[in-house]
Structure formats: C-alpha cells, structure tokens
C-alpha cells in the first residue's frame, strides 16, 4: 500500500511541485449526523467528502449511495458499492436501535444529536492516517485510534461508559477496522486519480473593494472581497506600498454554491490615512500575477462612470419628451 501511495503522489504532484501538493485535498471522510427526537423517532444523515468537496451521500430510506460527481465511484465495482450500501444500512439501523435502547444507561434526554466523522488521509511520505471522532450536541465526545477508544474530557462519564461499552462489540470493531484500514485507503487513492481534472482545477478569483460600517468617529472600514477562487488556499492582505498592515482582519473562507470560495478581509483606518492603501491577493491560479486594488480608485472610477451616464440619460429623456410633444402637436394640426 505504501508503494502505491508513493507512486500516486508522484503522479499527482510531479517533482518540484510539493507546494501544490499542499493545496489539493488528500483526505476522504464520512460525516454522520443522527438526530433523536423521541424513543420512536430518529433520523440520520450521512455524506462523504474529499476535503471540502462533497462526493456523495447515503439515503437511509432507500439504502442507496448517491454519488455527486461522475468520478465519485472511483474504481469500485457495482457489486462492491452494493456491499457497502448493505453494510451502511445495517450499521445505521443498528446504531439507532442501540442508542435508543441504552438511553437510561447514559442518562440522556430527548431530543439530542450525535455527530461523527471518520476517514483516512494521504499524508507526506506516502503514508495513510486514519481517524474517527464522535461528538454529542456539538461537543467532543470520543476518538478512536489504533483500536483504542479515547473519551474526550468534554464527554465526562458518558464518554467513558461508551468507550467501555463499544469495546465489547467485536463485530463493530472488525467492521470499522476493515473500512478504515482497507476500504478507505483504496478509495482515497482511486478517487484522487479519477477526479484529478476536477480536484486540480484552477479558478481565478474576482476581487473588489467596498466600504463597511464605520467603526467609530473619523474611522473607515475598508473591505476587500475575494470570491470565486479554487483551490481554497489564498493570501489576502491590506498593504501600504510593500508594507503589510498588521491590523488586517480576515474572515473565514466560505464556500460558494459552485464549489469555489469566498473571503472578506477588512481594515479599520482613520479616514485621512486611507489614501495609498491597497488590497493584494495571491492565489495559485494567478501564477504570480497578484491582484492589487487601490483604495479610492474603484470609487473614483465609479463616480466617473456615474458622472458620464447621468447627463447622457437626462439628455436622452429630454429628447424623447421633445420628440413626443412635437409628434403629438403635428397630429393635432
């Protein structure tokens, strides 16, 4: 498996391209969210991801895997997919049943929600790491590593009891170990190859400036918007000349509907000091040609366009009115 992983890394990221290797997602993980409303009603949602790219989901009502990408199936045969569907269906039904039957053991009250994430990651050197973590109501509950269950401090006695309980289910351990150490590594290696054109696409960002709400008397909030870029890593900074402005505030990199990304970066500054500031954007798709937007230029250009358009529109309206009145007057005569 290690030799295969190293060969794939060499194929995906040729020599001298290690910086790009850090940009592309190399981990596959599944997310499970199970909501328990009462002792008879529960709902689970499961989805599979390559980094931040959704690959598919599991429909627990029909017991089928729904692939979101043409290449999401990777090199798995229809028979293998069917086996996974049956395994997931048995797991989901068993998980819900066990939780509901052991409510009193863990002193839990309805409604509540359990979240879980499990998967594997192709890391530097060609090795593959595995992970499984669980959360209760959004708080860390436990993690499983090397066939050992580790209760999280936030989980308290409930997490300790759960780890003690799950160790008794050898069948569950065997299934998890097989999925994490065999199925997942094979899948991540395959899907990275089959989805390479999409995974390694380059989409250039759009950038523009705006003014945010005033942070105080005599102050301006300068906002630099960067949107539509892929892959996710991006560098955005407010600058004065070549000097980075340490007061720059960066928001979270958020997903767009088309699987590109959006980032907003702000700077609070005295109004008289805004002149000469610029927003610089670095992204792999730009190939070293950084985007630089100067504060005031976009505003002045907008005013110039407005100053040209408004008089033209006024003249056009006056001409139409004059023509209409002249035409109406001639009809009367």
Curated annotation (Swiss-Prot):
GO terms for molecular function: endogenous lipid antigen binding; exogenous lipid antigen binding; lipopeptide binding. Glycans are attached at residues 38, 75, 146. The chain crosses the membrane at residues 303-323. Disulfide bonds join 120-184, 149-163, 224-279. Residues 324-333 are cytoplasmic. It is found in: Cell membrane; Endosome membrane; Lysosome membrane. A motif (Internalization signal) lies at residues 329-332. Residues 197-295 form the Ig-like domain. Keywords: Adaptive immunity, Cell membrane, Disulfide bond, Endosome, Glycoprotein, Immunity, Immunoglobulin domain, Lysosome, Membrane, Signal, Transmembrane, Transmembrane helix. GO terms for biological process: adaptive immune response; antigen processing and presentation, endogenous lipid antigen via MHC class Ib; antigen processing and presentation, exogenous lipid antigen via MHC class Ib; positive regulation of T cell mediated cytotoxicity. InterPro entries: Ig-like_dom, Ig-like_dom_sf, Ig-like_fold, Ig_C1-set, MHC_class-I_related, MHC_I-like_Ag-recog, MHC_I-like_Ag-recog_sf, MHC_I/II-like_Ag-recog. Heterodimer with B2M (beta-2-microglobulin). Interacts with saposin C. During protein synthesis and maturation, CD1 family members bind endogenous lipids that are replaced by lipid or glycolipid antigens when the proteins are internalized and pass through endosomes or lysosomes, before trafficking back to the cell surface. Interaction with saposin C is required for the loading of bacterial lipid antigens onto CD1B in the lysosome. This is T-cell surface glycoprotein CD1b1. It comes from Cavia porcellus. The lineage of its organism: Eukaryota, Metazoa, Chordata, Craniata, Vertebrata.
